Regions:
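Conserved helix-loop-beta element of the AMP-binding
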Residues: 3, 22-25, 50, 71-75, ...
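Conserved S/T- and glycine-rich ATP-binding loop of Class I adenylate-forming
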Residues: 24, 30, 65, 73, ...
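Acidic/polar alpha-helix N-cap and adjacent early helical turns
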Residues: 335-346
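Conserved AMP-binding/adenylation subdomain of ANL enzymes
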Residues: 4-23, 33-71, 86
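AMP-binding/adenylate-forming catalytic core of the ANL superfamily
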Residues: 66, 73, 195, 200-201, ...
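Conserved AMP-binding/adenylate-forming
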Residues: 47, 100, 107-126, 130-230, ...
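Short, hinge-like loop/turn segments at secondary-structure boundaries
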Residues: 68-70, 91-93, 141-145, 283
Length: 346
């Protein structure tokens, strides 16, 4: 029942807007919430489904999109990063690709702009998790947004959008679990969700996974505006608390990846004797890039408050990823979390 309801919700115009005229490529493994539930939606509406197999590199995906005339594709940002590099290398304009759905982690603004300006492809930002089967929200603009400029629309598209009919979301005060916060777009708190395809309990466990009043706490920190658009600030476990003030790792990563000489970046908390935690950036340079630590740190200077600017940039050859393409920040914290303490002793 829950899968059928979610499939109906996912196919709606304000969701994926899928029909029998579409050709869909989910670049998401079947072990990850059944490829985000897309095979069920495709079967329901008669959409052609193209499965990528083991070839998840940019060149293979570019060839698949061009050969099968894919109209909509889904994946995490690291997948699209490889696709954009490959499409540019082979001079493909991806002419049939009209919509790409990005979830799993926040889409960098520069990536969304590239899809829009270079490939005339609409990016649909989405949010969900295994416990939400996974559909939690999708970003489709409202009619009142039509009059906005492209850059103003982009700022709205960078949010995770609105929940479809069938689920509800709310935010609660971070320190006091069930104190509901206003939907003013500014007040942040714990993102909680409930609905027809949301978890009740984990497999093999008798106790409920929900709060006393029936909501599932997602572990995300977010704001919700008056139109219901969710804007994820961070995973609660990835927030950086420096001197009692919160710093969003997502915001720092988006800034770093907006630099043309950076291919990938992760922001993590490093232990600091005075401030408890300070942000540092772990980054991979773009091909043939000669960027320095000082150059990247200066890039932050006019974009955020001075106290939010990372203390260090550490360049690496690779960043560990999960099987679904998400950065393994736990591993990065274990490897680099003491780097500021080490620099004090040297």
């Amino acid at each position: 029942r829950s899968t059928v309801l979610q499939s109906y919700a996912g196919a709606m115009p304000d969701s994926l807007n899928l029909s029998a005229r579409d050709i869909m490529l989910p670049v998401v493994p079947m072990f990850h919430v059944n490829a985000w539930g897309t095979p069920y939606i495709a079967a329901m509406v008669g959409c052609t489904l193209v499965l990528p197999g083991p070839g998840l590199d940019g060149a293979s995906l570019t060839a698949l999109i061009d050969e099968y005339k894919v109209t909509i594709a889904l994946g995490v940002p690291t997948i699209w990063q490889g696709l954009l590099l490959a499409a540019k290398a082979v001079n493909s304009s991806l002419p049939t690709l009209k919509r790409n759905v990005i979830g799993g982690s926040a889409c960098p603004p520069a990536m969304m702009k590239t899809f829009r300006d270079v490939y005339d492809c609409e990016t649909i930002h989405a949010w969900g998790m295994t416990e939400t089967s996974p559909l939690g929200s999708l970003n489709q603009l409202k009619s009142k947004h039509n009059a906005l400029s492209d850059d103003e629309k982009l700022q709205i598209r960078l949010s995770q959008g609105r929940p479809p009919f069938g689920v509800e979301v709310r935010i609660t005060e971070q320190e006091k679990g069930m104190v509901e916060q206003p939907n003013d777009g500014n007040t942040s708190g714990n993102l909680q969700i409930r609905g027809h395809w949301i978890i009740n309990a984990y497999y093999g466990k008798n106790e409920s996974a929900l709060t006393e009043d029936g909501w599932f706490d997602t572990g995300d920190i977010a704001t919700i505006d008056a139109d219901g658009f969710i804007n994820l600030q961070d995973r609660a476990k990835d927030l950086i608390k420096s001197g009692g003030e919160w710093i969003s790792s997502v915001e720092l990563e988006n800034i770093a990846m907006g630099h043309p000489k950076i291919a990938m970046a992760a922001a993590i908390a490093a232990i600091h004797r005075k401030w408890d935690e300070r942000p540092i950036i772990i980054a991979i340079k773009a091909q043939d890039s000669d960027i320095t630590e000082a150059e990247l740190l200066h890039y932050f200077s006019d974009k955020i408050a001075k106290w939010q600017i990372p203390d260090r940039v550490i360049f690496v050859d690779s960043i560990p990823l999960t099987g679904t393409g998400k950065m393994l920040k736990k591993d990065l914290r274990e490897q680099f979390g003491s780097v500021l303490l080490e620099s004090e002793t040297n």
